[in-house]
């Protein structure tokens, strides 16, 4: 189906900031092209974290096969290397059935790792790392993310503001070498990229995107987000887990601990999500391979582009 013997597997990648409509576009394209949807969002891999990660609705999931959602528990440290392995396996399986893989997500690091591999980077410095870990505990991961944005904006744009492990690592590399981690990654040229990719980015006006984000967060709280977080805590998952430090979960944990009001938590989730979306856009805009499209306005032309690509 559009892949000649010996040629690379064709892969459509739908990117864009949070709340831009990626999940629905992925399903509609999969229906039009005879495809399966593959998750590329670092938070949607976790079981039991549904509302706060804005997983595709049961109605969307019922329309076409979805892969790599709900695959690990929240206390598992699921890395970009883990993702590359699992996604590669799933894409091979989809292709073997004569179906077409449609990758969808906002985690730039996952997508970059899948299609290009992991770049070599310097070793570790235990002293520097210990100091950064202490800063993360006292100031919070978001403060370190702001610090990273000053010295390595490309890495900061790619990482969740609460992704403490990777933020600490990026700062550690810079403090050790004086060189941004993103530069090490940029210098890493991939001898054999395994996929022939069509990257589609959903273009959204910033004001419209921020409005969508605010509405989505209100909807999340109305649909039981606080109860979801409370259930995870009651199940024994620590608020200190990497997954529980994600935007939304961290703020609701603070509300449940009594350190802020419900309204304050909601407003913080909205603000932090808007900031994250802005950084996602910064990251995606730097990729000249992304073809920007308007959705849902131009679905027919998007579908035509994808069909022509698959052949």
From Swiss-Prot:
Top-level lineage group: Bacteria
Key word tRNA processing present: yes
Entry keyword NADP: no
Binding sites annotated in the UniProt record for substrate: 18-23
Binding positions for ATP per the UniProt entry: 16-23
Disulfide bonds: none
The protein's Enzyme Commission number: 2.5.1.75
Catalytic reaction(s) noted: adenosine(37) in tRNA + dimethylallyl diphosphate = N(6)-dimethylallyladenosine(37) in tRNA + diphosphate
GO biological process: tRNA modification
Database matches in Pfam families: IPPT
HAMAP family in the record: IPP_trans
Similarity comment: family membership: Belongs to the IPP transferase family.
Protein name in the entry: tRNA dimethylallyltransferase
Species for this entry: Geobacter sulfurreducens (strain ATCC 51573 / DSM 12127 / PCA)
Chain's gene name: miaA
């Amino acid at each position: 189906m559009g892949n000649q013997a010996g040629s690379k597997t064709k892969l459509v990648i739908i990117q864009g900031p949070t709340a831009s409509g990626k999940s629905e576009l992925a399903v509609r394209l999969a229906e039009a092209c005879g495809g399966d949807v593959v998750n590329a969002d670092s938070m949607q891999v976790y079981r039991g974290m549904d509302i706060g990660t804005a997983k595709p609705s049961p109605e969307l999931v019922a329309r076409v096969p979805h892969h790599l959602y709900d695959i690990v528990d929240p206390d598992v440290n699921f890395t970009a290397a883990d993702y590359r392995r699992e996604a590669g396996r799933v894409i091979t399986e989809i292709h073997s059935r004569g179906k077409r893989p449609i990758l969808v997500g906002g985690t730039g690091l996952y997508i970059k790792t899948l299609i290009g591999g992991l770049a070599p980077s310097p070793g570790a410095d235990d002293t520097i790392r210990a100091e950064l870990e202490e800063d993360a505990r006292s100031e919070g991961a978001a403060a370190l993310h702001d610090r990273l944005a000053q010295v390595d904006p490309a890495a900061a744009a790619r990482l969740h503001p609460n992704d403490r492990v990777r933020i600490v690592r990026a700062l550690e590399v810079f403090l050790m070498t004086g060189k941004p981690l993103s530069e090490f990654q940029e210098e890493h040229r991939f001898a054999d990229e395994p996929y022939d990719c069509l990257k589609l980015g959903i273009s959204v006006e910033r004001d419209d995107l921020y409005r969508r984000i605010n509405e989505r967060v209100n909807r999340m709280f109305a649909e039981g987000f606080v109860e979801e977080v409370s259930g995870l805590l009651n199940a024994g998952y620590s608020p200190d887990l990497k997954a529980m430090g994600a935007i939304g979960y961290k703020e609701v944990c603070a509300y449940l601990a009594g350190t802020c009001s419900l309204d304050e938590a909601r407003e913080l989730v909205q603000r932090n999500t808007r900031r994250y979306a802005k950084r996602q856009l910064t990251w995606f805009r730097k990729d000249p391979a992304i073809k920007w499209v308007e959705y849902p306005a131009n679905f027919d032309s998007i579908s035509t582009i994808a069909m022509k690509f698959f052949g």
